[in-house]
Structure formats: structure tokens, C-alpha cells
Amino acid sequence: MKDPAVEIEKLREQLHHHEHLYYVLDKPEITDAEYDALMHRLQELETKHPDLLTPDSPTQRVGGKPREGFIKVRHSSPMLSLDNALNEAELRDFDRRVRDLLGGAAFRYVTELKMDGLSMAAHYNNGKFTEAVTRGDGTTGEDVTENARTIRSLPLRVKTKLPAFEVRGETVMSRRAFERLNTDRDEKGLSRFANPRNAAAGSLRQLEPQVTASRRLEYYTYFLLTEGRPAYESHWEALTALKQMGFKVNDKSRPCDSIDEVLAFCAHWEGERENLPYEIDGVVVKVDSVEQQRRLGFTAKAPRWAIAYKYPARQATTMIEGIDVQVGRTGALTPVANLKPVVVGGVTVSRATLHNEDEIERLGLQIGDEVVVERSGDVIPKVVRVSSQGSYRKPFKMPSHCPVCNTKIVREEGEAASRCINANCPARLKESILHFASRGVMNIDGMGDALVDQLVDREIVHNIADLYDLKIEDLMDLDRMGVKSAGNVIRNIDKSRRNSLPRVLTALGIRFVGERTAVFLAQAFGSMDAIERATVDELQQAEEVGPKVAEAVVQFFSIPDNRELVDRLRKADLQFTYAYSRPKGGPLTGSTFVLTGTLPNLSREEAKQLIEQAGGKVASAVSKKTSYVVAGEDAGSKLDKAHQLNIRVITEAELHAMLRGE
């Protein structure tokens, strides 16, 4: 019989190894299912042998019970801020000061991307993670140990000869995780986070560690200390050691032998910053030698041996000269500010979104006001706030009729957007075609704004289905269209006929039906015809389809013009059927589960994956077709409904037993 302590330790070693490969090196060696199997075997053993549970176990990453507040902790040595260099001249001044203070001695720099997140120190004893503290005021921070434990790229144990040490680094949220988080908050009716930095800071300081665990934070290290002092004689050596110990270190960091090399590094990443998976706001430049750092010393607030080269601000102040209204593919009217041109983050900006009428009212904004404009990535710039009211300000009023087709606009109760309800509005048609042809939908390369404008304005295309009737000669007389480019567009249109039913559903532009919902509808019904005939109640049996989505689908197919459009697309040989079969033979085949509350060890997503891998189905709402409700702490109305419908309620432990076929 196996010694459980030995098996537990072996499982922990395996899981730590695979977490490092996946979350730090991005080089996984096993599948998610294999990782889950190891994790759940460890959870099973720790449940049976609670005396063997330790804080550094991978199972403890999911987060513990909510806290009442954060304890203040004094840092082993101050986490100082850095002086800033805002241009090349200031960076060269820094270099001159360093050379003067070092008396002409040879030295080199290390350059690191300045990641835009929340600074945090993590402490280890005998290779095991023990404590995490935010930067705070630089002298004292907040104990966020339980929240930090949920960050997968922060190792809970490392192999090292150092008996006790501290790492310092930046807690960040990737652009992708940020977009997912805001999309999720939109669906729940919650306010959006302004930027990834705010999202990372708010996530790390959650009173409920399980919320932090769901936010996909990452931790990049840049300092290694023992007893509050650098552990190695060069900064580059310390970064190398951190990598070898299993910490995530930004792989863009470089040693530089001169200030010209430093400036070249800064210029390169300023041009590439929008292509990075995370946000940066500059470059940190450090003298590499720790001995030379000591000689250079500190000012009252910052080290003399390091500086932050800040990229141009992505906020600027300018004046609103007017407000236009744009019409989207769903008919939503969006007010857009016409700005006095201003450079924001190196790009000249003359327009910025105002989102909707409520946002204008919230900002207290009028034409003629001075406003702060922010630009982030490829997203259209937005107005953040009014900085000063104009002397001759003029209030904006949303038009009562569509600015393109003059149809009376409608604003439904509970909605922020006003809408043009004319399905034949030229502006709506243009946006619908662009959506239909976009990457990730029907992916018709070459179908851009300029071509779509001409197709609609010259009345060559009256609806989406007309695209499949186009011939090369229809495009030949259009601006910037030759035989070759016209042929490419026609070939790409033809190739799009092979796209799957979920893509076709997404392309139709039905309200609330995005890529994910389209997949669930295709899986549940198998064909466009079945979806078109389905009732609101029947549609809600599909995974993650609630009343709002179901009603939108039924409403779409109730409109004769939409049914005619779908019929024409069917005749154009688009894919209207979908072959999908759920995993068969699993222990949960035929059962539908609903998850509610906070589970002890599994996140919602982890539980969902396990159920589906075992052949089961996870629904978002409790109904008569629900087989089991898996309830954790703080279960809400779903638990009450389960009791009302006499549906069996089970714990996470019972779910694990069912997964094992018991």
C-alpha cells in the first residue's frame, strides 16, 4: 500500500513542475485534462489526510475564506520610487551624472520594460512562499499573502540554497485577461475597469481570495534580496538566478554597454508596445553592478543608479469642437466627439467616443469644454473627464431621428443606447457587412471600409446575401480595384461558404449572440432550421442561453426580411448544419448540472470543465431539466429554486465521487 505522504509529496512536485512550465515558460508538457487528474488526486488525498495539508500545496491556490481587512506590514528595506526621464536629453543627463559619480569607471546598464501594474514583495523561507506585501507607501504595505497565493506564475516553493529571501516584482493583468474581465462585467451589469493596472490593483486587494483567483493575474520579478539587500553582485546575475529558481522574469530585459544602446532599446519597445500582451509605460534603466549601485547611493526619495524612462503620456487635454452621431450595425447611436487635434501617446487624435447619452450626462460635458482624452491600444480614444468648462459651452442633445436615414429613433427602457430601428438604414448595412466579413466571423479578407462604402453607396449591395452574387466585373469599376484585387475578394467570399454554422450565426448579428453563444446554439440544435423554429423556452435549454438571448433570437427570426436573408444565405450554400456529439460513456453522461456559491477547491470554470469531460452538461439556470445543483458557500437563489423544484443538491466532494464513478 502506498504511503500517502510520499504520494502527496510526489504529486506536489509534479504539479509545481507543470505549473512552472505552463504559467512561467509557456511550454506545457501535458494536457489540461492530465493536469486536472493530478490536481484532483492530490485534493482527494489531502481531504482524506488533512494533517498532511500544507500552505505551499498547489491545491491552496484557489483561495481561502474572505478577510475582514488587510494588515499593515513594514518592508525589509524601502521600496523606493524612481526618478523619471521624459525624453532623450533627460536620459542622457542621467547617464552623465552616473559617469561623473563613478569617476570614469567602466559600467553597464540593464534595461527592463516598465510594466504597468502593482508592485509587490514576496517572501520565502526554506524555499517556501510565506508572505506577500504590496508596495504601499514604500515603507509599509498591505499583507496580501492569501491573494498572492492564487497567482499561478508565483511559485509556492522553489529549489534554492538561500535559507530566506525576498523577491520584488510587478503584479499585472494581461490585455486579454482584462478584456475578458470587462466583457464578463458588462454581461453582469457591473461597471468596467478603466485599464489593466486598475484591474490588477483591485484584484490583488480583494477581501475574497477566490475573486483574485478568477482574475488571471501574473507576477513578474525584478529584484532578489536577502536581509533587505541584493543577493548577487550584479542585477543581471540576479535576474538570471530568478529565472533558474522558477520565477517569471520579463524576457525582454537586456544588458546595455552604452546610453546609445539604452536609447535604441527604448525606441524599439516604444514602437512595439501595442503588440505586447501586457501594458507598459516606459523602460527602467539600472546600473548593473551592485557595488557601483552602493557607490552611487540614493537621494531622499529615489536611487541615483536607476531611472524610469517614461513613454509619452497616453492622456492629453484638448477641446471638444463638436459632436457627431454614428450608427452601428444593431442601430445603436453612438455620440463621437470632434476634438481639436492633440497628440496622445505619439498619435494625433481628433475624435473620441462618448459611448452614449448617459455617459455625456455623467461627465457633465458640453461642446466647447476642455476635456482629458485617453488612448489605449487600438481602441478608439475616449473622453475621461472634463478638465474645465468652456466660456461658450453648448449642450448636446441626442437627435430624435436617425442622422443617416431619418427614421425616428427608439430608446428601450433599461437600455443606455438609442437605436435606429430601420433594418435598411445604409449606415446599419455598412456596419453589418463589416461585421459579417470580419476576422473571426466569416473572415472575408479585402472587404474593408473603403470597399463596403462603395458597394452600399453605389447600390451594388442591398443586404449581406448580395455579397454571394457578386462577380469580378461588379468590382472592376470601383476605386482602387483592379482585376487581381477584385478576383481576390471574390475568391475570399467564395471561401467563406465553408465556415461552420456557429460562424454563420455570429455573422447574422443577432443581438446578444456572440461567438460563444453561437457555438452553444449550434451544439444544442444542430441546424439553422431548428434554431429558426425554436421557441423561447426551447432556446433556453441550450447552454448559457437565458431569456434575454432567447427572446432576441426569436425576435430576429420573426422579422420577414431576416427570414428572407437567411433563406438566401442557405441558397448560397453556406453551412446550415452542425455535427456535434458530446463525450459519451463518461460517468456524468445525460446529467445536467448547475453551479452556485463558492466551492472549497474548484473554480466555476474548473468544475465546468471536469463535468463536461465526464460527459455532463453545465447550465446557467436551474430548471426542471436540471439533474443536480452543486452548491458551495454563499449559494444564492439557484439553491432556493433547486429546493422548490425538488432537485438534488450536492457538495463538491459528492461531485468528485460522481466523477470517479462512485
Swiss-Prot record:
The active site is at K114 (n6-amp-lysine intermediate). Coiled coil: none annotated. InterPro entries: BRCT_dom, BRCT_dom_sf, DisA/LigA_HHH, DNA_ligase, DNA_ligase_AS, DNA_ligase_CS, DNAligase_adenylation, DNAligase_N. Zn(2+) binds at C402, C405, C420, C425. Residues 583-662 form the BRCT domain. It is an enzyme of class 6 (ligase). Pfam families: BRCT, DNA_ligase_aden, DNA_ligase_OB, DNA_ligase_ZBD, HHH_2, HHH_5, Nlig-Ia. GO terms for molecular function: DNA binding; DNA ligase (NAD+) activity; metal ion binding. Its cofactor is Mg(2+); Mn(2+). Belongs to the NAD-dependent DNA ligase family. LigA subfamily. This is DNA ligase. The lineage of its organism: Bacteria, Pseudomonadati, Acidobacteriota, Terriglobia, Bryobacterales.
